[in-house]
Amino acid sequence: MAVRASEISRVYEAYPEKKATLYFLVLGFLALIVGSLFGPFQALNYGNVDAYPLLKRLLPFVQSYYQGLTLHGVLNAIVFTQLFAQAIMVYLPARELNMRPNMGLMWLSWWMAFIGLVVAALPLLANEATVLYTFYPPLKGHWAFYLGASVFVLSTWVSIYIVLDLWRRWKAANPGKVTPLVTYMAVVFWLMWFLASLGLVLEAVLFLLPWSFGLVEGVDPLVARTLFWWTGHPIVYFWLLPAYAIIYTILPKQAGGKLVSDPMARLAFLLFLLLSTPVGFHHQFADPGIDPTWKMIHSVLTLFVAVPSLMTAFTVAASLEFAGRLRGGRGLFGWIRALPWDNPAFVAPVLGLLGFIPGGAGGIVNASFTLDYVVHNTAWVPGHFHLQVASLVTLTAMGSLYWLLPNLTGKPISDAQRRLGLAVVWLWFLGMMIMAVGLHWAGLLNVPRRAYIAQVPDAYPHAAVPMVFNVLAGIVLLVALLLFIYGLFSVLLSRERKPELAEAPLPFAEVISGPEDRRLVLAMDRIGFWFAVAAILVVLAYGPTLVQLFGHLNPVPGWRLW
C-alpha cells in the first residue's frame, strides 16, 4: 500500500491539477447531497403532504418551508453547479493541452469558493437569509449571505483567468493553429459566463452589499430583479455547457464511437456565447416598468437559443448512431440496442438528454410572450428546470464520476459499484420524469410555485392526481440519492489504488469531420472578435432599459417575512 501511495503522490506531483479538481468535485457533490436531502420535503409539499414538522424535529435549525427551499435552491442550483463547472472546465482543457494550469490561482479559486460558501451558509442555517435562491429585494438577508455569495461567485473569475492563461500559452507555442475542441469550448464557456455574471456582480456591489451593511436605506426591486436576470437566465447555460462539453467530447468514446462533427460542436458553443445573455426579460414578462418592445426582443432571442441545443441533439444522436452501428447494430433502431447500456458513464448523460427533450419544449413555452402568462409563477416552472439542471446536468455529472474519479485518484470502480451506479441513474431519471409530469400538470392547474401549499390542503382539490405524482417522485428520488451517497463514498473511502488509472489519458473522443482547413472553423477561432460581438449584444439588449430604470430609482426598505 505504501508503494501505491507513493506512486499516487508522484502522479500528483506531475499533475497537481488532479488534486485541486478533486477538491472542487468533492465539495460540489457534498453541496448536491445536502441540498438534495431537502428535495423530498419540497416534493411532498407539492403532494399536499406537510413533512416539515418532522424535518424540524430532525434538524431543529430548519425553521420553515422557505428556509428549506432556500437551502435546496442555493446548494443545488448555485453551489453544486458552479463547483462542478470549475472542476470540469479547467481540468479538461488542461489535460487536452497537456499543460499545467496556474496552481496558485487554482487553489485560490477553491479557497475563495470554500470560504464564500461557509460565510454564506452561516446565515442560511441560522434562518437569517431565507430569501430563496433568487434573493429578490425587498426580501432582505443578513450581510454575510450577500458577502459570502459574492466571494463564492467571484472565485469563477479566477477560473476564467486560469483557462484564458492556458489558452494564451498554448497559442504562443502553436501560432496559426486552431484551438483544440475542448479548450475552445472551455474558453467560450468562461467568456460567456464573464459577460453573464456582470449582472449579479453589479447587483451585489451597487445595491445588495451597501443595503445589507446599512449604508443605504433601500433598494429598487425592479432594478435588482433586472440585474439578477441579466445573470439569472444565462446561468442556465453555465449549468448546461459543462454537461454539453462532456456529451460532445467524452460520451461518443464511452459509446464506442466518434464525434461526427468538430465544427458543429464549435458552432453550438459559439452561438451560446452570442445568445445566452441578452434574454433575461423573458423572466420579467409580468413586471411593470420595462417596455414591451424590449420584452419581445428578448423573447425572440430566447427562442434563438434553442438552435444550438437542437444542433447538439442532431450531432450527438448521429454520433451515438455511428457508435451503435460500429458495435453491430442493424436496422432502423437496432443501433440503439447495441449501445453500452451496462455502462453508467454512458447511460447517465443519455437519460439526461432524453429528459432534456421535454424540458426544452417547456422552455419554448416559457420564452413565449403570450404562453408564459399561462404558466408564470406556477409549479410548471420548477417542473421545467428540474428537467434541465436536475436531470441533464446532474445525471451527466453523476455519470462523469465513473471515468473521472479513477483518473483523479487512481481508485478503481468495481463491477458491483457500476451496477449500483446503473440503479442510481435509472431511479434518478425515473423520479425526475415522474416529478416533471406532476409539477407541469399542477402548474397547468394553477398551483403556484414557491408556496407552502401543504399548509392549505383544501386549496387545490382539482390537482389531487398530479400531487400523487409528486409524492411518488419524492420517494423514488430519496432512494436514488441514498444509493448515490453510498456509492460515491464507497469509492472515495476505498484504500485500493491503481496508479496507472491516474496516469491514463482522459477518454476524449476522436472526430470524423475535423476542423482542418475549414474557413468556418478559422472564423470561429477568432474568439476575441466574437466576445466583442457578444458584449455589444448585451449592451444593446440591456442598455436602454437600464438607463431608464437607473434614472427613476424607487428604493424601498427591506422586508423580513420569515
Curated annotation (Swiss-Prot):
UniProt keyword annotations, A-Z: Cell membrane, Copper, Electron transport, Heme, Hydrogen ion transport, Ion transport, Iron, Membrane, Metal-binding, Respiratory chain, Translocase, Transmembrane, Transmembrane helix, Transport
Q: Note the topology in the membrane.
A: Multi-pass membrane protein
Output the superkingdom of the source species: Bacteria
Using the record for this protein, list the coiled-coil segments as residue ranges, or answer none. Answer: none
Keyword Translocase part of the UniProt annotation = yes
GO cellular component entries: plasma membrane
Cofactor names from the entry are:
heme; Cu cation
| Transmembrane intervals | 21-41, 74-94, 105-125, 144-164, 187-207, 227-247, 267-287, 300-320, 345-365, 385-405, 420-440, 471-491, 527-547
Q: Which family does it belong to?
A: Belongs to the heme-copper respiratory oxidase family.
Q: What name is this protein filed under?
A: Cytochrome c oxidase subunit 1
Species classification: Bacteria, Thermotogati, Deinococcota, Deinococci, Thermales
